[in-house]
């Protein structure tokens, strides 16, 4: 009789903000020794808003996962440049970001971030919003945020947010819209080591550092 394959027990994972306790301890110490009480309370309010938003828009997901998601990354600074990418649900946003950067032919030598759209001035703003998930090193200088190595691809509720903004290199400002295209079960012959992968694409990526004319 063939030996049975041992199944890996799945568990639920939901991202949590690191250093939250240290943040509150630092704020409480500062409240006792400063006259800038209103400014500090405002920072706490902003953090509570960020934390509430993430709690409502990130979901618990099973790890490991056999779900494969597809996204279309549409480059915004040049027409008709996009890539459809498939990735396992239990791979991280950091892995997805690194992959699209590499597929564009760029060096991963700058920070990146994903942004949830936000209503501003009567319209929808998709980049540099109040609700970001950034690479390690990204901070808003006020309070701790989630980072892309802590958030799984399947952690985001795409029924609420089928489009996210993505930015690589906050100086040269390479902007993308990331569109959720769907989810499927992995085939038994597919290996996670082969993901992420491009399944369709159009256009030619621009140079990472274009030549500017003085």
Question: PLM ranges: what are they?
Answer:
Residues 1-214:
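Short linear regulatory motifs enriched in tryptophan with gly/pro/ser
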């Amino acid at each position: 009789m063939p030996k049975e394959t041992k199944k890996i027990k799945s568990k639920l994972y939901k991202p949590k903000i690191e250093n939250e306790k240290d943040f509150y301890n630092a704020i409480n110490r500062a409240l006792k020794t400063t006259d800038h009480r209103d400014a500090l309370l405002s920072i706490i309010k902003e953090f509570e808003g960020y934390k509430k938003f993430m709690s409502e828009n990130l979901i618990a997901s099973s790890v490991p996962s056999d779900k494969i998601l597809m996204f279309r990354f549409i480059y915004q600074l040049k027409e008709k440049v996009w890539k459809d990418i498939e990735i396992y649900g239990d791979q991280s946003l950091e892995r997805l970001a690194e992959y699209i950067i590499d597929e564009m032919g760029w060096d991963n030598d700058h920070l990146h971030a994903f942004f949830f759209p936000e209503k501003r001035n009567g319209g929808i703003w998709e980049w540099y919003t109040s609700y970001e998930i950034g690479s390690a090193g990204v901070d808003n200088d006020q309070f701790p945020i989630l980072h892309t190595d802590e958030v799984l691809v399947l952690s985001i509720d795409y029924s609420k947010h089928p489009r996210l903004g993505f930015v690589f290199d906050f100086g040269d400002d390479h902007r993308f819209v990331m569109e959720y295209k769907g989810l499927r079960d992995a085939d038994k012959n597919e290996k996670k080591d082969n993901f992420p992968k491009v399944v369709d694409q159009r256009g030619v990526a621009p140079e990472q550092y274009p030549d500017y004319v003085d």
